[in-house]
Amino acid sequence: MSDFDLIVIGAGPAGMSATATAAHGGLNVLLLDEQPRPGGQIYRNVGENRSSRGWLGKDYAAGARFVDTLTHPRVTTQCGATVWRLDSGPRVVWSRDGVSHISTAKHVLLAGGAQERPVPFPGWTLPGVMTAGAAQILMKS
């Protein structure tokens, strides 16, 4: 069991910003996200795609500074983590690589991010047809 001042669930722009702000304010923060790297959908793989930043735009490149803030000594980042229970206390139960963990904190912040909601149209399930979000993931992978 580990204790933190704040547990942030979600490592997209909002989660990373909240984590950095809290850490710079003196709080010990645990940042959890299910993806293999922080960044959310908009900054997916920004730390890995340094050569692609130019053609993905300056806003995408700016996301690297968010990822860089996660190296603060008061921040513990766990990517590839699945949160499967949140109890009073608050107590967060999560797993990573098949190992379960229990972390407690004074506060929990949920930064679940955005989710694309596609609108079905004739032919939308045909091979090669994809949503804007799927195309964005493909470009950044």
Question: What are these language model-derived features?
Answer:
Residues F4-A62:
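Beta1-alpha1 glycine-rich phosphate/pyrophosphate-binding loop at the start
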Residues M1-F4, I9, A62-S141:
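FAD-binding core/adjacent interface of flavoenzyme oxidoreductases
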